[in-house]
Amino acid sequence: MAHSKSAEQIKKLVLERNGFKSFNPMQELALQKDWQNSSMVVSAPTASGKTIIAELCTLNCIFNKRKKVLYTSPLKALASEHYKDWKKKYSDLGIRIAISTGDFDSSSHYLSNYDLIFTTNEKLDSLITHRAGWLSNVGLLIVDEIHELSSSRGATLEAVVVKMRYILAGLQVLALSATIPNADEIAEWLNAELVVSDYRPVKLMEGIFFNNVIDFGTYAVELEDSDYVEAIVKDTLAKKKQALFFMSTRKNAENLAKKLAPIVSKTLFPKEKLSLQKLSEKVLNVLERPTEQCKLLASLVEKGVAFHHAGLLAKQRELIEEAFRESKLKVLTATPTLAAGVNLPAFRVVIPSLYRYTEDGMQRIPVREYKQMAGRAGRPKYDSTGEAIIVARSEPEKEELWDSYVEGIPEDISSALAYWPVLRMQTLAAIASHFIFDYTSLEEFFSKTFYCKQYGRLSSLIERIHE
């Protein structure tokens, strides 16, 4: 591998590889910190360019510290996207890049030959449990979507961060987060410098659709069709733009795609139809014997529409994402997993319902989740603004949604260890992986958690575990 590089050389390299002339205001804020050595928490809107900070820190760690970098994400799709992006930009520099997201029963010894490893939180937890020897040579841990600490899988993420800092003194941690009110708490927990920015490359307009009008507060868009979905899509296509619909279930995403296909199909040019026909064949032939879902997806793709959810085959997902980025597909109907980081912006993001099925029945989604979905509106380089649209069913609901969501502030991130079943499971996991072996080590381990930072009630936590 090449010799060490100065900060200026690394900055120049990152700008070149991304085709930028300069860093944006959020990135400049981060560069004012000690990004080469200190841990850092970056809290900024979706699509503000946080991954550029990750690229700078990664190159510095590999070239100057001669240590490995671990990049952990909440989703396989996200890890895969980052992996492909890095391979494309940097593999010619002699950086050995790997991805490891499956097979939880292995220490994945082969990874000792790589400099940069993309993984998921669950896989990283497994690598730590199996005491992969090469972990001792990690100099930088990048935690993508650290706001996921509050989610149902947040306890695993918290445990992974605690364990990595436990076994590696002086580990540099770079935590990337959507906009959250208590980013300072996470920074204190990680003993990290804090970068907070509201910068977005494309101006975001948030509005509410009701009674054939999209109200954006400062202006309104009147639509003609009585069916709101059709009206929004027709208006978007007339503007030569794309729309992304976030649906609460896979079935809803598929059904909406079926409904919209004939509308979109009518607007396609012969050249576009030919291109989509070829794409449709690729989607269909991913499997030797296509399933019913494969056939449905292929038939929709031919009409310029696709659905996107976790049930798609990896290769199909890749084809769909690429075609949407290239504007071949005009409308995408997706489940909210897509909001969690996969970079697929559209001029318009439409959210027909803010309710989700949970264990306790139908519940409104958190403001934070809405803001993440809305943040996908607007394509840098293509749009000067992006529009995020919520659908209201009545005038009072419209006002309430405006106050709660459009003007709403995302919720604080809180530790998932506050829930007893989760705490119990993580304690047993820490015992199984030999982080806890007596009362003292139990106390020491939990003193390093985000839970302890937030609540400071270590004694009551220990008492609960003892019970």
Task: Spell out what each predicted region is.
Residues 171, 344, 348-358, 363-404:
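Conserved segment of the helicase C-terminal RecA-like domain
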Residues 70-71, 80-83, 87-98, 251-331, ...:
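Conserved C-terminal RecA-like helicase domain
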Residues 162, 172-261, 301, 306, ...:
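Conserved interdomain linker/interface between the two RecA-like ATPase lobes of SF2 helicase motors
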